[in-house]
Every structure is written in structure tokens, then in C-alpha cells.
């Protein structure tokens, strides 16, 4: 029997920001498929050391560290997001991990405004640091110098080349199906093999993780078939028991399908988040996005009034105005389950598919 060694990466969102990530590796042997009992047989940090020389999104308080720890406990390796540069918030998330060995992810252009946050993360001796959305070279040497594997999330083959040149040891290839921030230029199904081939030619020891549209074992199996070492999972973990998501937000997300999601900059304009123009975000569409998508200049001109409406809607949890940042895979999410069950089921189902 073949043994499947996937990376399990979780990205969690509570409807406002795509800032919480998880990275991990789980060992799954089909001989033990009934119990999935050896998912955590080898610690993820040890496996990362074996494979890498020297050595896995809306905002809201309190759950990302807890969820990252739960993914780690399940045999994955949780990755806590650094948010938009608030040190107190990051330190609170570190406390939430309760000592679990996790990694940390940062929005790169935001980290550049408060680079001291990287020191907070490196002080935890993390399993990895993940950088997304911007130039990672100013931080790469510090991360590698600390003996921490550097993970880079990319949306194009050009970005993957830059990540390899900067010394990334793990590359997350994110397709436009993904929830939260990214780019819509490439799909997961074509970007992943492009990046896999590039890595094979230039840096065979670098791991490739597929992101975007993966919510179950079928997606994991497909990613492995494309040559990826594993998957980054966001929307499915948004509906994990450990995610601090309000009942109304969960209801909105679980009721939605992939056809209900849109890529737009409207949400960032209203929240006054200064994202670079090349990035937008996928979310469940609503009256706000329908009204203003394609009319961003007019939205900016009327922003004070729209922001007042948005703030009232946020207080009332009015999802015709506020939204949940989830990906196209939301149509595959039908319930709320513990993170451990999500990890075990995904790996078990992928192994069954690949060994048929």
C-alpha cells in the first residue's frame, strides 16, 4: 500500500479578514484508515526538518491562536496570522496557542509598516514564517538566519520565481478560487503544476502547497495528483468548531454556494484597507458588492456615507452589507466540525481515492 504524506494547511476566516493561517504535515497510512490513528505519528516540525535543510481570513478577536493549536494537535501545524500590524493583537494570539508549536503568517506589505512584529513571531521559535502579498526579500534573511523555514504564498509563476530567488523553502500556489485576498489571474488547477515544474527545475527540495478551492479529500487528492506536497485549506476551517465565528455568520456562509462568491475591491475600500491594486478579495456577494462593484470611483467619493451604513450593519450583523470572506469551496461546506475531524477526514478520504 502506498503511504500518502500530505501537507495540511488551514486558513481561517471569521467574515472580516483573511489573516489567520495554518500549516502542517500529517502522515496517513491506508492500513490504519478506519481510525486514522497515525495522523500525528510524526511531529510536523520534525517532518519539516526532514524535508527542508535545518529543520501550511476576516478579523475578530480571540480564535485564531486557538484554532492553530487545534490543527497542530490534530497532526497538522497551525499558523497564526499577523493581521494588519497590531502588536497587542498578535501577542494575544500567541497566548491563545497555549504553548503549541505553530507558525506565523504575515501580510507582507503590512509587515513592512511594523517590522518589529516579525521579531515577536521569531521569538516563539516557530515552525515556519509565511509571507503573502508583497516583496518578501527584506525579511527573508532574518527568517532564514533564525533557522526558521520560509513559506511564500504566490499567485503567479513570476511571483514563484521571485520567491525561489529569495530562498523560500515552501511555496503556496494560490489560485483565484481561494477565499479572502489574492488575485484572480490564475486557477489552482493550472497554477499548481506550473509551480511544481518550476520548483523541480530550480529547487527540488522546495515544497509546493496548493491553495484555492480545496475543502475535502477530493481536493487534497487532486492537488497531490498535480504534484503538490499538500494543500492550504481556508474555507473549510472557517467552519471549524474552534473558529470564533458568530452563528449568523456561519449560517450565511454555509447557506452560500460557490456561485454566490465574487472577487472585488469594494470591501477593502469601505474598510479603508490600503491593499495594493493588484489584489482583491473573494467573498459572498451581497447588496453592497452588487451596488458598488465596478463603480469604485463613485464609492470612494461617497465613502463617508457608505462607511456609516457599513458600521451600522456590522453592529447589527446585517449580511446584506457586511459579508464573509470565503472561497468557491464554500459550496462543499455543509456543517461545523472540530478541526481534528476535518483534518483526519480529509486525509483519510484522499488516501482512499489515491489508492483505489
Residue ranges with predicted function:
Residues 9, 16-19:
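Ser/Thr/Pro/Gly-rich low-complexity, intrinsically disordered segments
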Residues 165, 178, 186, 190-207, ...:
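Conserved active-site-proximal phosphate/metal-binding subdomains
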Residues 2, 13:
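Detector for the Zn2+-coordinating histidines of canonical Cys2His2
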Residues 62, 213-215:
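Residue-level detector of alpha-helix initiation sites
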Amino acid at each position: 500500500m502506498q503511504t500518502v504524506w500530505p501537507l495540511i494547511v488551514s486558513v481561517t476566516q471569521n467574515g472580516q479578514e483573511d489573516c489567520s493561517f495554518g500549516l502542517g504535515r500529517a502522515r496517513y497510512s491506508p492500513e490504519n484508515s478506519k481510525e486514522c490513528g497515525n495522523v500525528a505519528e510524526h511531529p510536523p516540525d520534525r517532518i519539516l526538518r526532514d524535508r527542508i535543510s535545518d529543520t501550511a481570513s476576516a478579523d475578530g478577536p480571540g480564535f485564531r491562536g486557538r484554532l492553530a493549536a487545534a490543527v497542530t494537535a490534530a497532526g497538522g501545524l497551525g499558523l497564526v496570522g499577523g493581521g494588519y500590524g497590531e502588536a497587542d493583537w498578535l501577542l494575544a494570539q500567541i497566548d491563545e496557542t497555549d504553548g503549541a508549536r505553530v507558525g506565523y503568517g504575515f501580510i507582507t506589505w503590512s509587515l513592512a509598516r511594523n517590522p518589529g512584529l516579525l521579531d515577536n513571531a521569531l521569538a516563539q521559535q516557530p515552525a515556519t514564517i509565511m509571507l503573502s502579498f508583497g516583496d518578501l526579500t527584506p525579511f527573508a534573511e532574518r527568517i532564514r538566519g533564525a533557522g526558521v523555514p520560509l513559506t511564500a504564498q504566490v499567485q503567479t509563476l513570476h511571483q514563484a520565481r521571485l520567491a525561489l530567488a529569495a530562498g523560500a523553502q515552501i511555496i503556496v500556489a494560490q489560485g483565484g478560487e481561494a477565499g479572502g485576498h489574492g488575485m484572480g489571474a490564475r486557477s489552482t488547477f493550472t497554477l499548481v503544476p506550473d509551480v511544481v515544474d518550476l520548483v523541480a527545475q530550480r529547487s527540488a527540495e522546495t515544497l509546493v502547497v496548493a491553495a484555492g478551492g480545496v475543502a475535502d479529500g477530493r481536493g487534497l487528492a487532486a492537488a497531490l495528483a498535480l504534484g503538490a506536497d499538500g494543500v492550504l485549506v481556508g474555507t473549510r476551517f472557517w467552519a471549524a468548531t474552534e473558529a470564533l465565528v458568530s452563528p449568523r455568520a456561519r449560517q450565511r456562509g454555509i447557506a452560500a454556494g460557490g456561485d454566490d462568491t465574487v472577487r472585488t475591491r469594494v470591501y477593502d475600500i469601505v474598510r479603508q484597507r490600503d491593499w495594493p491594486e493588484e489584489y482583491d478579495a473573494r467573498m459572498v456577494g451581497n447588496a453592497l458588492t452588487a451596488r458598488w462593484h465596478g463603480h469604485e470611483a463613485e464609492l470612494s467619493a461617497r465613502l463617508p456615507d457608505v462607511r456609516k451604513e457599513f458600521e451600522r450593519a456590522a453592529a447589527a450583523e446585517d449580511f446584506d452589507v457586511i459579508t464573509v470572506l470565503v472561497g468557491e469551496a464554500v459550496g462543499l461546506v455543509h456543517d461545523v466540525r472540530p478541526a481534528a475531524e476535518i483534518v483526519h477526514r480529509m486525509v483519510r478520504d484522499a488516501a482512499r481515492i489515491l489508492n483505489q
